[in-house]
Amino acid sequence: MSLQENVIRPTANFPPSVWGDQFLTYDEREDQAGLEKVVEDLKDKVRQEILGTLDVPSQHTDLLRLIDSIQRLGIAYHFEEEIDRTLHHFYDAYGDNWTGGATSVWFRIMRQHGFFVSSDVFKSYKDKNGAFKEPLENDIVGFLELYEATYLRVPGEVILDDALVFTKGRLGEISNDPLWRNSIVSTQIIEALEQPVQKRLHRHEALRYITFYQQQASCNESLLKLAKLGFNLLQSLHKKELSQVYKWWKGFDVPTNLPYARNRMVECYFWSLSVFFEPKYSESRMFLAKVFAVETILDDTYDAFGTYEELEIFTAAVHRSSVTCLDALPKNYKLIYRIILSLYEDMEKILTKMGKAHHLNYIRNAMMEYIGCYLKEAKWANDEYTPTMEEHKEVTTVSSGYKFSLIASFAAMGDAITDETFKWALTMPPLAKACCVLCRVMDDIVTHKEEQERKHVASGIQCYMKEFDVTEQHVYDVFNAKVEDAWVEMNEESLKCKDVKRPVIMRVINLARAMDVLYKNKDHYTHVGPELINHIKSLVVDPIMA
């Protein structure tokens, strides 16, 4: 088969990569071994601080704040067992009736770790008339903590719905008050209103919080030093990984061979880093970065290059998943097929080493479902058919690639993943569905106008406008509400999924968090500008200065 001649293709003319080949090489730090010894000593010291006051109720509020700082400084992965032990101790001792201070922090942390504590603790925040009490001038931080706690609410928690509206309004007023305008608290408020803690990427939050934490009188110097050294050491690992995946990508010379496709390997690694940053997930992180790169090529091939007839043949070849299919494909599709096979080979090596080679079948099945839905979209575009919202949702929550991304993210996670994990994810349970809906809707909001400039399947925005005869702005309002509803539903499902291990749940939540960076307000992934460039540089280029 050869590419069809005289075909008018809906090429999108995407912007080129902004990075060049700067990540092709990696220089390892000479002082790394010495720093690792310092980190281990600091970890021992902090570990003793966590466990030293566990049996002293009068110090539980301080212990809670220590755990909060550890989490927000990005070093909780060093102390998973100690934190888990502490929070179980809190739950056994207090249940829903926390008697210490910092109630909002307690509520947020407990729910973040899967403890379904009651929101009734906030009834005391209301006056006798049922209205929320105004923040005291000397406790603006406590008011901000209540705001952050509301983002862990579940459907039907009216008290937290009301608290969000109340705190959001008051915090906006406080941030503009001349008395607070240039203060650290004002900066915290502005950042929280832009993106609450529950939606932040762990590594970005670590950078933010280190800057804030070192200015506090209560700053724990051991904790701060561990956070800074740990960030830089982990950044060295991330740089090395990025170099490895970039070399893999460079070998296919995508800009030359597939000039219609977005060249976004660096952004793909950042995306994967957003899903998991911890050292133990190194192989998972590199594999998922490659998955995102493959998904980008497939997206651009199905949306902005291929004819329906070509895509039918290519889809059938992917379903067969055999090197013997190469001869039947034209040049462009041959390369894409080789990249997919390379992806499978990488995963098979990793899984075989783990004794879980059969898990590759789940990834292949997810890929076939994903690419099959792409073909359905291509047929809609070819037939100039505008689907109903229900039809659109059923197909595009899969063709968007987020379900496949979730399943691929599990692949190299080791003992945390079983056959049941993959079976659970493949059925699109409520937690995964809410995440995929959130991702699809956020994507639609910021990409649909540019997509419709070429021949493209109707977006969710267009489908909704046609079916319900409403304005574009009305659909934006509806879709933005869907995003917030999805977050609330994910909160609930993450608390209810008792048979699903916490690391699995966190992959789902972190994928949603990544969307709040890549697709918030604009398509930062396609049109890489200063904001995303700075995000990426801060994580894989610029170390923290001691």
Swiss-Prot record:
Residue sites binding Mg(2+) 3 per the record: 443, 451
Motif DDXXD motif location, chain numbering: 299-303
Entry note: cofactor: Binds 3 Mg(2+) or Mn(2+) ions per subunit.
Entry keyword set: Lyase, Magnesium, Manganese, Metal-binding
Xref: Pfam families: Terpene_synth (PF01397), Terpene_synth_C (PF03936)
Entry comment describing in which tissues the protein is expressed: Highly expressed in roots, lower levels in stems and leaves and detected in disk florets, but not in ray florets.
Keyword Isomerase among UniProt keywords: no
Enzyme Commission identifier(s): 4.2.3.136
Catalytic activity: (2E,6E)-farnesyl diphosphate = (-)-alpha-isocomene + diphosphate
Entry's Gene Ontology BP terms: diterpenoid biosynthetic process
Sample GO molecular function, one term: terpene synthase activity
Binding site for Mg(2+) 1: 299, 303
InterPro entries, per database record: Isoprenoid_synthase_dom_sf (IPR008949), Terpene_cyclase-like_1_C (IPR034741), Terpene_cyclase_plant_C1 (IPR044814), Terpene_synth_N (IPR001906), Terpene_synth_N_sf (IPR036965), Terpene_synthase-like (IPR050148), Terpene_synthase_metal-bd (IPR005630), Terpenoid_cyclase/PrenylTrfase (IPR008930)
Gene3D superfamilies from the UniProt entry: Farnesyl Diphosphate Synthase, Terpene synthase, N-terminal domain
Enzyme class at the top of the EC tree: lyase
Positions annotated to bind Mg(2+) 2: 299, 303
Function: Sesquiterpene synthase involved in the biosynthesis of alpha-isocomene as the major product and detectable amounts of beta-caryophyllene, beta-isocomene, silphinene and modeph-2-ene. Produces exclusively the (-)-(E)-beta caryophyllene enantiomer.
Listed PANTHER family: OS04G0344100 PROTEIN-RELATED, TERPENOID CYCLASES_PROTEIN PRENYLTRANSFERASE ALPHA-ALPHA TOROID-RELATED
Comment on protein domains: The Asp-Asp-Xaa-Xaa-Asp/Glu (DDXXD/E) motif is important for the catalytic activity, presumably through binding to Mg(2+).
Protein name: Alpha-isocomene synthase
Organism: Matricaria chamomilla var. recutita (German chamomile)
